[in-house]
UniProtKB/Swiss-Prot annotation:
The lineage of its organism: Eukaryota, Metazoa, Chordata, Craniata, Vertebrata. The chain crosses the membrane at residues 33-53, 77-98, 113-133, 178-198, 226-246, 288-308, 320-340, 347-367. GO terms for cellular component: mitochondrial inner membrane; respiratory chain complex III. Gene3D superfamilies: Cytochrome Bc1 Complex, Chain C (1.20.810.10). This is Cytochrome b. Heme b b562 binds at H83, H182. It is a multi-pass membrane protein. Heme 1 (or BL or b562) is low-potential and absorbs at about 562 nm, and heme 2 (or BH or b566) is high-potential and absorbs at about 566 nm. Heme b b566 binds at H97, H196. Pfam families: Cytochrom_B_C (PF00032), Cytochrome_B (PF00033).
Amino acid sequence: MKILRKNHPLLKIVNHSFIDLPTPSNISSWWNFGSLLGLCLMIQILTGLFLAMHYTSDTTTAFSSVAHICRDVNYGWLIRYLHANGASMFFICLFIHVGRGIYYGSYVLSETWNIGIILFLTTMATAFVGYVLPWGQMSFWGATVITNLLSAIPYIGNTLVEWIWGGFSVDKATLTRFFAFHFILPFIITALALVHLLFLHETGSNNPSGLNSDSDKIPFHPYYTIKDLLGIFLLLLALMILALFFPDILGDPDNFTPANPLNTPAHIKPEWYFLFAYAILRSIPNKLGGVLALILSILILAAFPLLNTSKQHGLIFRPITQTIYWTFIANLLVLTWIGGQPVEYPFTTIGQIASITYFTIIIILMPVSNTIENNIIKL
């Protein structure tokens, strides 16, 4: 008798991707975050769908519709907080996933890596337009400040900003289109994630040793389905603790005040997961320069495959680059902290030093340490 999962046209695809997929036998828990990102995406789409059933994208009722969801809809408060904190969990998993890719040299799988960068940018865009929807003070002013950055583009900047706003300021048209974008983008992310998986399964997964593992592969199921389940339970536990005990800890108090164009908050800042990029943006006094630095802070990830000169795969046997890598992570945390601080001394100076360090590590220090380690091998 033929096994259905191996012969059915649709099940065959699922089988080759999640059941009989040949997987390196030594991949660690750092490889769990891909599946956790898939889970986060499903949670966000489901909770978002239920929120969209009760939300109204109109400037006069948006804020009160969110209050209505929390007060009057059955378990609306839970759905809303799962969605808001689910975004934070999404980005935590995303940062770890990218960090693991850098540490273990997964960027050599260039198609998978480049699709991943597009996924990262799309997720950031989705989170940004989503943050505008509750129409609180920080939502409104965050939207105004970030969209206004496009005016730095020569010649077409001002026209582009007004085109995105749908008028001469952030208003009803802006909110409506941001809601439309926020609804459609997760489905684009899902499609991109499938392409990401497709490219990954063309080459096979990387592993911690950085060595070829073709001679030592095991089926994905049951070994890694069980391993992923543990990660899933831990993620759900963390999300539930966050949503039930500390639902507003990662939010901004200003967002409990309805949007008011006549009153600017003392410190305008985005959600915590954008603070590192926001700090880089603020560290450059020139508007266009800041915007370029902001874009480059993400796009520089595409330079990793190009700047890699090491004869070894990953950092597991490379102590010099390991030290530089962890300095880079510490520097990212400093940038995140600085992004949430007011624009005054000493924070501006620290931000400028951390921003220079961010780019220096990637463009100069890592390639130099690669060359040093290559020469040490020859000795």
